């Protein structure tokens, strides 16, 4: 399939309560309003058997070894990826609310080896664009429902932020378009910036892999 016909693979990352999920939905709605084919994917996908186990972990209903939960997060992405490829080949732009970068950033924040954290997702498709919504963890902590899940603690989020900054540097050196936006701006302003970035992203004929 030519690059003119395939869909784009767009990832939006951010700290918890950064407004990421809202922006993902706004982007999908915008693309559809422009008569483009678009679909939203949220990771973790809590509807699958693996996703339900992750959901229990995040809600602190069960305890799991850090390595085990990291591999479950990765498996949750792998079990969806064939469908994402199929959609992209049909010309559907796929918007991902979190991806492998979150897996690395959060697990490494718990002290797991950096390269080990990256390894389970090697081979997943490389996005055409990654947008990181940057917000001060202390500001995010003031937003509604903060603290309901395991990782929603300021100290943890500060470590995750540093890891995202490291990921951006490493992947940009590999040629990935990885952009940071100030998520403390208004909802409308952030949305407008995201739409501009997505509209102007350069795509290759085929997706590379991580």
From Swiss-Prot:
GO function terms (MF aspect): ATP binding; dTMP kinase activity; nucleoside diphosphate kinase activity; UMP/dUMP kinase activity
Catalytic reaction list: dTMP + ATP = dTDP + ADP
Superkingdom: Eukaryota
Gene3D superfamilies: P-loop containing nucleotide triphosphate hydrolases
Pathway of action: Pyrimidine metabolism; dTTP biosynthesis
GO CC terms in record: cytoplasm; cytosol; nucleus
Keyword entries, A-Z: ATP-binding, Kinase, Nucleotide biosynthesis, Nucleotide-binding, Transferase
Regions annotated as coiled coil: none
A Pfam family annotated for this UniProt entry: Thymidylate_kin
PANTHER family: THYMIDYLATE KINASE (PTHR10344:SF1)
Function: Catalyzes the conversion of dTMP to dTDP.
Similarity section: Belongs to the thymidylate kinase family.
Protein name: Thymidylate kinase
Organism: Schizosaccharomyces pombe (strain 972 / ATCC 24843)
